[in-house]
């Protein structure tokens, strides 16, 4: 499924992680 998390590498931007 898709989880909503925060990507520190993008400097605090929301990204979607497929697991």
Swiss-Prot record:
It comes from the Eukaryota. On the 2D-gel the determined pI of this unknown protein is: 5.8, its MW is: 41.7 kDa. This is Unknown protein from spot 67 of 2D-PAGE of etiolated coleoptile. It comes from Zea mays (Maize).
């Amino acid at each position: 499924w898709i989880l909503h998390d925060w990507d520190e590498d993008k400097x605090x931007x929301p990204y979607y992680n497929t697991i």
